Protein backbone atom coordinates (compact mmCIF):
# COMPACT_ATOMS: atom_id res chain seq x y z
CA UNK A 1 0.00 0.00 0.00
CA UNK A 2 1.10 3.53 -0.77
CA UNK A 3 -0.11 7.08 -0.19
CA UNK A 4 0.42 9.67 -2.94
CA UNK A 5 -0.04 13.19 -1.58
CA UNK A 6 0.86 16.73 -2.66
CA UNK A 7 3.07 18.59 -0.19
CA UNK A 8 1.09 21.82 -0.70
CA UNK A 9 -2.44 20.37 -0.84
CA UNK A 10 -4.61 23.35 0.19
CA UNK A 11 -7.66 21.28 1.20
CA UNK A 12 -8.31 21.68 4.92
CA UNK A 13 -9.34 18.03 5.16
CA UNK A 14 -6.22 16.52 3.61
CA UNK A 15 -3.09 18.27 4.86
CA UNK A 16 0.22 16.66 3.95
CA UNK A 17 1.26 16.48 7.60
CA UNK A 18 -1.75 14.24 8.27
CA UNK A 19 -0.85 11.96 5.36
CA UNK A 20 2.71 11.75 6.72
CA UNK A 21 1.41 10.90 10.18
CA UNK A 22 -0.89 8.18 8.84
CA UNK A 23 1.89 6.81 6.66
CA UNK A 24 4.09 6.42 9.70
CA UNK A 25 1.29 5.06 11.91
CA UNK A 26 0.18 2.45 9.36
CA UNK A 27 3.64 1.64 8.00
CA UNK A 28 2.64 2.70 4.49
CA UNK A 29 5.10 4.37 2.14
CA UNK A 30 4.34 8.04 1.38
CA UNK A 31 5.14 9.47 -2.05
CA UNK A 32 5.22 13.26 -1.84
CA UNK A 33 4.26 15.26 -4.94
CA UNK A 34 5.60 18.81 -5.33
CA UNK A 35 5.01 21.58 -7.83
CA UNK A 36 2.44 21.88 -10.57
CA UNK A 37 0.80 24.68 -12.52
CA UNK A 38 -2.58 26.08 -13.50
CA UNK A 39 -4.27 25.77 -10.13
CA UNK A 40 -7.83 27.09 -10.01
CA UNK A 41 -11.06 26.64 -8.14
CA UNK A 42 -11.94 25.37 -4.70
CA UNK A 43 -9.03 24.05 -2.62
CA UNK A 44 -10.57 20.59 -2.24
CA UNK A 45 -11.36 20.06 -5.91
CA UNK A 46 -9.41 18.44 -8.72
CA UNK A 47 -7.83 21.54 -10.30
CA UNK A 48 -5.50 22.36 -7.41
CA UNK A 49 -2.60 20.52 -5.81
CA UNK A 50 -5.34 18.29 -4.35
CA UNK A 51 -5.76 16.76 -7.82
CA UNK A 52 -2.03 16.92 -8.71
CA UNK A 53 -2.75 19.61 -11.35
CA UNK A 54 0.30 20.08 -13.56
CA UNK A 55 1.78 16.83 -12.25
CA UNK A 56 -0.85 14.39 -13.52
CA UNK A 57 1.42 12.63 -16.00
CA UNK A 58 4.26 12.13 -13.53
CA UNK A 59 1.88 10.84 -10.86
CA UNK A 60 0.12 8.54 -13.33
CA UNK A 61 3.46 7.11 -14.49
CA UNK A 62 4.51 6.50 -10.88
CA UNK A 63 1.22 4.74 -10.16
CA UNK A 64 1.58 2.69 -13.35
CA UNK A 65 5.06 1.66 -12.23
CA UNK A 66 3.64 0.72 -8.83
CA UNK A 67 0.92 -1.43 -10.40
CA UNK A 68 3.35 -3.15 -12.76
CA UNK A 69 6.16 -3.78 -10.25
CA UNK A 70 4.62 -3.53 -6.79
CA UNK A 71 7.10 -0.79 -5.87
CA UNK A 72 7.72 2.90 -6.34
CA UNK A 73 11.09 4.08 -7.55
CA UNK A 74 11.22 7.33 -5.57
CA UNK A 75 9.70 9.01 -2.52
CA UNK A 76 9.11 12.37 -4.23
CA UNK A 77 7.69 13.52 -7.53
CA UNK A 78 8.81 17.01 -8.61
Where would I find each of the regions flagged by the language model?
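C-terminal catalytic histidine-bearing segment of alpha/beta-hydrolase fold enzymes
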Residues: 27-78
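Solvent-exposed loop/turn segments at secondary-structure junctions
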Residues: 7-11, 36-39
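Short alpha-helix in the alpha/beta-hydrolase fold that links the catalytic acid
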Residues: 8-30
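Short beta-strand/loop motif that positions the catalytic acidic residue
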Residues: 2-5
Amino acid sequence: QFIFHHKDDPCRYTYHRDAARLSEKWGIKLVTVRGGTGFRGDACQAFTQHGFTGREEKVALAIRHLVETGAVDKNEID
